[in-house]
From Swiss-Prot:
The protein, known as: Uncharacterized protein F15G9.1
Segments of this protein annotated with the region Disordered: 1-111, 137-233
CC terms in the record's Gene Ontology section: striated muscle dense body; striated muscle thin filament
Protein species of origin: Caenorhabditis elegans
Listed Low complexity bias regions: 1-29, 45-59, 170-186
Sequence ranges of Basic and acidic residues compositional bias: 30-44, 221-233
Biased composition, class Polar residues, residue ranges: 189-205
Compositional bias (Acidic residues): 142-153
Superkingdom classification of source: Eukaryota
Length: 279
């Protein structure tokens, strides 16, 4: 094997170098062949191994022929397999033909009627027919009267509804239309008396009926009457105070020790309880 490769790579002058590729390649191949020779010389086809493991061809010849069909009778015949009892019962039930139910006719016993019984039977039949005819006549006459009464009731109800609707549409005497629309300012001036001080709408008193229709807010005259004779206090305007502060006028020398009480509304009646206001 090494000689074949060495012959093809002998001319080393073709590659332009002194290195001989053929010699190195052949030496490597010979060493590899030498190593693998030991494995190649081993004998795997021993008699003991072949006897325990038969070849595949023996199995193929046993279960198949040239056409590829199975030759085993037990595997080919599926009917030979055991079947459970319930399966056998199902198969036998399916094999039966459906049967139609037979109807048994039983003849009723015939009774022999005598002449007296026949006459009684016929008379009863005639009485029943006459009663039915009478009932039909009475039933036919009643619906006509009831229909007329229902029509009268419907007409009466319709007339009542029309009368009620016309009464609703007419102007009721309780609610009269508003003739004049008064402004808020005029209403507040009438209630309060001083239009410039209070321009807010007067709140409605919830229990005004219980209190006798008390107007709210109360007028200044009513407050004075309830409060009694109040002491006339001197009024200080803010403009006067500002003017005095700007000019720097000081009148402390003219004032007495009790002057500040009268100036800021603290008179001789401060701290005293007037009992005439209490009931």
């Amino acid at each position: 094997m090494s000689s074949r490769y060495t012959s093809s790579y002998t001319p080393s002058s073709r590659y332009g170098s002194g290195w001989d590729y053929s010699s190195s390649y052949s030496s490597s191949r010979t060493s590899r062949d030498r190593d693998t020779g030991s494995y190649r010389d081993r004998d795997y086809s021993s008699t003991s191994y072949t006897s325990t493991r038969p070849r595949y061809s023996t199995y193929a010849s046993k279960y198949s022929t040239d056409l590829g069909k199975s030759t085993d009778k037990g595997m080919d015949d599926y009917s030979a397999a055991p079947i459970a009892k319930d399966e056998i019962e199902e198969l036998s039930y399916d094999a039966k033909t459906p049967t139609t139910p037979t109807e048994e006719t039983v003849d009723a016993p015939r009774e022999v009627l005598q002449e007296s019984q026949i006459s009684d039977f016929v008379e009863e039949d005639d009485d029943q027919q006459t009663e039915v005819e009478e009932v039909k006549l009475t039933l036919a006459s009643e619906p006509e009267e009831s229909e007329e009464e229902e029509d009268d009731e419907d007409v009466r109800k319709a007339q009542e509804l029309l009368a009620a609707s016309t009464q609703i549409r007419e102007s009721s005497p309780v609610s009269s239309p508003v003739k004049e629309v008064s402004s808020a300012a005029s209403l507040f001036a009438n209630d309060n008396g001083n239009e410039t001080e209070n321009r807010t709408p007067s709140p409605t008193v919830l229990n005004a009926k219980k209190l006798g229709g008390i107007p709210w807010p109360p007028k200044s005259s009513d407050v004075k009457k309830e409060g009694g004779d109040a002491e006339a206090l001197p009024k200080k305007r803010v403009s006067d105070l500002i003017a005095r502060f700007n000019t720097g006028v000081v009148e402390e020398s003219k004032k007495t020790d009790d002057a500040y009480k009268n100036e800021y509304g603290a008179g001789t009646n401060v701290g005293k309880v007037s009992t005439h206001n209490f009931a």
